[in-house]
């Protein structure tokens, strides 16, 4: 199936669209606008709330390196994040990517599907800014801490915060004034310069109207 934008509906193709043709592009662009999450490494079964480790591809080293660097800043290099052995502090085995458009929210929840909750989660933000709420171990408890996270910001959930409720009640749009100051949010020039190919225009426009949150963690 692909979206027929002129007729505002779906049409069935006799065969799948080929890479690079117009129908593939229109189908991909429509689906990209609907994208809300993806897995990095082992797929996550949202129904059973388990990671399918037997089908786990390797996490991209660039993603793992960025998260390890974040943890080194927080805990210090002596924590030995990438040393070989069963007791290493962080391996970055799997990740979840969440995609938010302005108006999207993420309800309060706890990341507790991993077997070892003593290991941290490193969370990286790209694109649009958002409000991040960190609560307590119960939704009924206070206080709740509110932070504005911008593109390039990182959050580490470790220790007590690893099992605390957290969520995203608000995503700002490009050009919107942030509540904490009179400054207007603009898409980072450094991030925009990464889209330097002619074919990247659609991806750049997608990034400008999306918040991407990538959280890396260990299953075991």
Walk through the language-model features, giving the residues of each.
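Non-heme Fe(II) oxygenase metal-center motifs and adjacent flexible, charged/small-residue loops
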Residues: 1-220
């Amino acid at each position: 199936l692909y979206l027929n934008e002129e007729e505002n509906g779906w049409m069935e193709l006799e065969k799948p669209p080929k890479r690079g043709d117009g129908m593939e592009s229109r189908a991909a662009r429509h689906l990209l606008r609907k994208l809300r999450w993806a897995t990095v490494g082992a797929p996550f079964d949202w129904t059973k709330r388990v990671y399918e480790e037997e089908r786990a591809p390797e996490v991209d080293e660039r993603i793992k390196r960025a998260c390890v660097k974040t943890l080194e800043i927080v805990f210090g290099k002596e924590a030995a994040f990438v040393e070989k052995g069963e007791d290493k502090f962080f391996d970055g085995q799997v990740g979840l990517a969440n995609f938010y458009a302005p108006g999207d929210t993420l309800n309060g929840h706890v990341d507790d599907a991993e077997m070892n909750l003593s290991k941290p989660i490193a969370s990286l933000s790209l694109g649009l800014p958002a409000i991040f709420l960190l609560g307590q171990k119960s939704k009924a408890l206070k206080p709740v801490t509110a932070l504005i996270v911008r593109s390039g910001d990182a959050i580490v959930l470790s220790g007590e915060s690893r099992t605390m409720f957290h969520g995203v009640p608000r995503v700002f749009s490009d050009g919107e004034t942030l509540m904490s100051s009179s400054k207007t949010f603009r898409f980072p020039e450094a991030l925009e310069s990464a889209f330097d190919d002619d074919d990247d225009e659609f991806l750049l426009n997608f990034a400008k109207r999306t918040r991407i949150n990538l959280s890396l963690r260990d299953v075991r």
